[in-house]
């Protein structure tokens, strides 16, 4: 639904806010306006950070400098003539991630929240070093070029056309970044079990994708991880077989050509495709190399893995001379795979678990063990911990969601299995992994995150308040309270060390670190008051392990017939040996049942296991406040330096009678508090210069945007001949977030505008000029969701209700009222098919009336209203399909 101006009458368009629904992220700030940003720098980097995080900033700056030297040697290149790389430290999201871009300047963002131990990046000892190695590789490769592109960048700045490497397929770019992170970090993804297990299981099942199936974005397991998994394994395979010097040579080939075409036979373009570029380096096409890669994995996975190869003492409850098969020891109860986490038994012979399916919205599911039927209990994303209270028949879980429209923090929720209702217990508390105290129904043990430290905490259900009871550590996850309430087991990570299992007293004192010096250990579960189970990273595998606190004996359930375990739960009862676990297989994580007494295990004595039996003194792993390092004095962030334009690019606008070439530039500071975009054009027929300027300020609660435009079109009328139509507009716009969470979003919109519209006829004397000054108000709601394999929105709704009024007392020539309503709904059929419904209603009244049109109008900048994604649904009908002062539209696609 858009409005349309007519050359035959003094009527101008009314904005119907479609862009707000297409680009809802533009209506709220990314970082809270109250954050005071500081910076430190050296010759190569500028680290920008919130006040109070200087120690992290100093460590980041030093680590980045070390990695830069190492990575430029690895890739055999130097970043010529580039300004300093900006690194922004973000502690506003309880998620582990990073990003990098060269546009409009080289910048990296690091989420300071460390990954949990079950993450594919959770095996590293140093999260900041790992993410910096990955993102710096992107920056170095993005900036690779040739003499021609380096010269052109001096003139046009960071114009994307002058950065050929960004056009390399994403799976190759991400594969190179994972390869580099693994070359510079012990915990890189190629050095830890997760990727190896996924690849081996997929290869063993004969599900490695063919070249044609892999190209692009595959929808089979592991979904969005595929470009990292296969890309990294492929690049690593090439480095091992053909030499690690071939990988940087490949980047140079991609960077040499300024555009992805070469010109042969005159000016006829011939694409230098991916196959040809690989062939120049490896003398084989990508398809041939991929077949070699597949054959390598088929050969490697022919034999079944044997994880127990160290000659330890083995015990099997059945017949050790005739070990059971996998099918005899594990009863799979799901088969579709994907991500299944935190399975727990409930008292009604059912299992509750979290299903994170990249094809649909995640949530908590329930599985009936007898019938094997599943049903979704609730929709919820960002779940990071789950606990079942058998006394209450309730699920307590933690999940990250938006808080105050800006932060994405983890909070505690309660799901009543009797009523299937969810209650949010905290807001913005940064609490994780809730576990009920067996002796106090109002007490919940959990982990609390404060700045860059993790603490054991107690949440009181009566007062809805939490209290820190332990020292701070680099990270803490997955806690469990012993049945006798004398110990709290936790997955613990100290600074630059591996994940371990530690015991705390109920008052938060660290009593013992059980697995110091072992591989990664996490996810403790109590069998009884003295036997503690957990997951152990052992021989490139994840297996069950246990510690008997009475004897200090360390058991490893390294049965070669058991797949790698990701999460598990024990059925309540001293004599009950049932266990449900989430296993790695070729489809992802599937749930299976096991009996502990049937599992083969081996015993290691305390000394052999490296157990730390002595009582540890309480200590803080969180960096203490210290004086800034010499030469690293912090100062306020210089946003003006980054706001200055860093590029110019060609642009155009047109109508049916005139094409106007022009230029565009834009800029933003690192915190996105200030941003602008400037476009200018010149028309040879109208002999006019157009300007379109927008500045946005995100330093207050409402996002404020100032817009000025002076645009001219050369038109023709059958009655009056050629004429020049001019629209001059000043707008002050405000966006007010009402409801922001991961499931849906709602905003208020306000607009004050002063607008002048005129037509100057070339064959007649005089001109028509009209003033339209007033306000616009709107409210918008959007719950439409895209998923990994979506080519359009797949479910949810979006709606908008808007009203506009022009006032004479503001200088308008007429009092005009206009209103519009738009509703869209998306219904998933058999995927990826979607049924979309669209209803639009509009009307205008007063001393004059607005003119609306309904249809997929093409804008004067060459893009359709629905955006440049041709697969977006609800494109509507062709331009000008229906025109009028009011009406409705309904269609189904």
Spans of features found by a protein language model:
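Juxtacatalytic substrate-recognition/specificity segment
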Residues: 28-163, 169
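Acidic/His/Gly-enriched intrinsically disordered linker/tail segments
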Residues: 31-33, 105, 120-131, 139, ...
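Transmembrane beta-strands of outer-membrane beta-barrel pores
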Residues: 652-656, 669, 680-686, 697-701, ...
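Outer-membrane beta-barrel initiation region
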Residues: 333, 342, 589-590, 595-705, ...
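C-terminal outer-membrane beta-barrel translocator/porin domains of Gram-negative envelope proteins
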Residues: 709-713, 719-720, 765-893
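Feature captures outer-membrane beta-barrel proteins of Gram-negative bacteria and organelles
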Residues: 414, 546, 662-669, 689-708, ...
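Beta/coil-rich, acidic/histidine-enriched accessory regions frequently appended to metallopeptidases
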Residues: 28-31, 36-39, 222-225, 250-252, ...
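A flexible loop/linker signature enriched in serine peptidases of the S9 family
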Residues: 190, 336-339, 354-364, 378-384, ...
């Amino acid at each position: 639904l858009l409005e349309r101006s007519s050359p035959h009458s003094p009527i101008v368009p009314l904005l119907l806010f479609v862009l707000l629904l297409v680009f809802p992220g533009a209506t709220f700030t990314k970082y809270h306006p109250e954050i005071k940003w500081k910076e430190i720098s050296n010759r190569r980097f500028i680290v920008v950070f919130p006040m109070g995080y200087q120690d992290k900033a100093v460590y980041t700056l030093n680590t980045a400098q070390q990695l830069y030297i190492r990575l430029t040697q690895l890739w055999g290149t130097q970043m010529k003539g580039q300004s300093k790389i900006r690194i922004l430290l973000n502690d506003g999201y309880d998620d582990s991630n990073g990003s990098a871009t060269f546009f409009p300047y080289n910048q990296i963002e690091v989420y300071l929240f460390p990954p949990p131990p079950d993450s594919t990046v959770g095996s590293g000892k140093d999260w900041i070093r790992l993410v910096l190695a990955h993102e710096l590789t992107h920056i170095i490769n993005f900036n690779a070029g040739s003499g021609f592109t380096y010269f052109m960048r001096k003139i046009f700045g960071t114009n994307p056309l002058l950065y050929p490497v960004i056009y390399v397929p994403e799976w190759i770019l991400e594969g190179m970044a994972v390869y580099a992170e693994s070359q510079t970090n012990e915990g890189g993804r190629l050095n830890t079990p997760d990727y190896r297990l996924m690849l081996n299981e997929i290869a063993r099942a004969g599900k490695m994708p063919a070249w044609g199936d892999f190209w692009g974005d595959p929808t089979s397991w592991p979904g969005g991880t595929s470009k990292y998994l296969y890309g990294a394994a492929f690049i690593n395979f090439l480095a091992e077989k053909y030499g690690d010097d071939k990988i940087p040579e490949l980047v140079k080939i991609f960077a040499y050509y300024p555009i992805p075409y070469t010109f042969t036979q005159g000016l006829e373009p011939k694409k230098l495709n991916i196959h040809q570029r690989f062939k120049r380096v490896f003398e084989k096409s990508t398809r041939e190399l991929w077949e070699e890669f597949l054959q390598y994995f088929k050969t490697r996975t022919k034999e079944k893995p044997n994880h127990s190869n160290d000659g330890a003492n083995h015990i099997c409850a059945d017949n050790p001379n005739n070990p059971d098969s996998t099918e005899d020891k594990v009863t799979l109860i799901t088969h579709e795979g994907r991500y299944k986490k935190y399975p727990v038994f409930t008292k009604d012979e059912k299992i509750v678990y979290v299903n994170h399916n990249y094809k649909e919205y995640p949530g908590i599911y329930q599985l009936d063990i007898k019938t094997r039927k599943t049903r979704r209990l609730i929709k919820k994303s960002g779940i990071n911990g789950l606990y079942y209270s058998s006394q209450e028949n309730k699920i307590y879980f933690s999940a990250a969601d938006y808080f105050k429209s800006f932060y994405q923090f983890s909070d505690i929720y309660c799901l009543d299995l009797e009523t299937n209702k969810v209650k949010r217990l905290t807001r913005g508390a940064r609490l994780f992994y809730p576990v009920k105290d067996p002796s106090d129904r109002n007490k919940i043990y959990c982990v609390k995150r404060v700045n860059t430290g993790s603490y054991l905490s107690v949440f009181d259900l009566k007062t809805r308040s939490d209290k820190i009871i332990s020292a701070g550590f680099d990270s803490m996850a997955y806690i469990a309270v012993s049945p006798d309430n004398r110990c709290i087991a936790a997955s613990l990570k100290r600074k630059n060390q591996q994940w371990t299992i530690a015991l705390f007293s109920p008052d938060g004192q660290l009593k013992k670190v059980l697995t110091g010096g072992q591989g990664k250990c996490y996810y403790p579960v109590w069998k009884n008051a003295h036997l503690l189970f957990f997951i152990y990273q052992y021989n490139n595998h994840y297996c069950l392990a246990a510690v008997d606190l009475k004897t200090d004996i360390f058991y490893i359930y390294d049965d070669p017939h058991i797949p790698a375990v990701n999460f598990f739960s024990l059925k309540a009862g001293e004599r009950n040996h049932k266990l449900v676990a989430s296993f790695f297989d070729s489809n992802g994580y599937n749930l299976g049942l096991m009996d502990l007494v049937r599992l083969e295990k081996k015993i290691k004595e305390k000394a052999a296991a490296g157990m730390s039996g002595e009582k540890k003194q309480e200590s803080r792993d969180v960096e203490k406040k210290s004086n800034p390092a010499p030469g690293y004095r912090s100062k306020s962030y210089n946003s003006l330096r980054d706001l200055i334009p860093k590029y110019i690019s060609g642009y155009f606008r047109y109508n049916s009678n005139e094409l106007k070439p022009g230029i565009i530039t834009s800029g933003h500071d690192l915190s996105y508090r200030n941003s602008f975009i400037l476009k200018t054009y010149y028309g040879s027929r109208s002999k006019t210069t157009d300007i379109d300027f927008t500045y946005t300020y995100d330093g207050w609660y409402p996002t404020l945007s100032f817009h000025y435009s002076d645009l001219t079109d050369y038109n023709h009328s059958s009655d009056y001949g050629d004429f020049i139509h001019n629209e001059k507009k000043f707008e002050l716009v405000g966006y007010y977030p009402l409801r922001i969470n991961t499931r849906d979003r709602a905003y208020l919109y306000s607009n004050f505008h002063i607008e002048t519209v005129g037509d100057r006829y070339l064959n007649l004397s005089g001109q028509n000029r009209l003033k339209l000054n007033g306000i616009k108000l709107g409210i918008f709601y959007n719950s439409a969701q895209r998923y990994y394999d979506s080519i359009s929105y797949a479910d949810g709704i979006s709606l908008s209700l808007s009203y506009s009024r022009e006032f004479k007392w503001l200088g308008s020539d007429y009092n005009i009222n206009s209103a519009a309503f738009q509703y869209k709904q998306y219904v998933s059929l058999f995927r990826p098919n979607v049924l979309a419904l669209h209803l639009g209603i509009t009307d205008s009244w007063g001393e004059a009336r607005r003119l609306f049109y309904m249809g997929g109008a093409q804008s004067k900048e060459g893009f359709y209203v629905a955006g440049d994604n041709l697969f977006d649904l609800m494109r509507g009908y062709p331009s000008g399909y229906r025109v009028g002062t009011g009406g409705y539209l309904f269609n189904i696609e």
